[in-house]
A protein has these predicted regions:
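Short, well-ordered beta-strand segments in beta-rich or mixed alpha/beta enzyme
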Residues: 2-9, 39-66
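Non-catalytic surface loops within mature trypsin-like serine protease
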Residues: 10-12, 58, 92-95
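Short amphipathic alpha-helical segments
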Residues: 14-37, 70-75
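Absolute protein N-terminus
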Residues: 1-2, 97
Length: 97
C-alpha cells in the first residue's frame, strides 16, 4: 500500500466549485478498486491550497483510476479551476506511531 498526495491551488472564486465537485464524486472515488482512504485537507494559512491524501493498494490500482472515465470527468472540471499547476507525489509510509 502507498499514499498519493496531490497539492492543488485554486482561484479564489472557484473554491466552492471545487468543493462541490469533490463532494459529488468523493464516494465514487473512494469506492474505486484499490482505494482504501480518501481525505481532503485545506491549508491553514492559504485557503486556496488543498491537498488530497489517498491510500492505494497498488500502483496499478491508481493507474486504472487515472485512466477511468470517473477520473477524466472529475479532472476535466477540476483543471479549469486551478490557479497554479498541481503537484503530486506517490510515497511509502515509513512510520506510523
Amino acid at each position: 500500500m502507498f499514499v498519493r498526495i496531490v497539492k492543488m491551488s485554486f482561484k479564489e472564486d472557484k473554491i466552492n466549485d471545487f468543493i462541490n465537485n469533490f463532494n459529488y464524486n468523493k464516494v465514487k472515488i473512494r469506492n474505486t478498486q484499490g482505494c482504501k482512504l480518501l481525505e481532503l485537507y485545506r491549508d491553514k494559512t492559504n485557503p486556496t491550497i488543498f491537498f488530497t491524501y489517498s491510500y492505494w493498494d497498488t500502483e496499478l490500482d491508481l493507474e486504472n483510476y487515472r485512466n477511468s472515465q470517473l477520473f477524466k470527468n472529475v479532472w476535466n472540471i477540476t483543471k479549469l479551476l486551478f490557479k497554479d499547476k498541481p503537484e503530486a507525489w506517490s510515497v511509502d509510509k515509513v512510520y506510523n506511531l
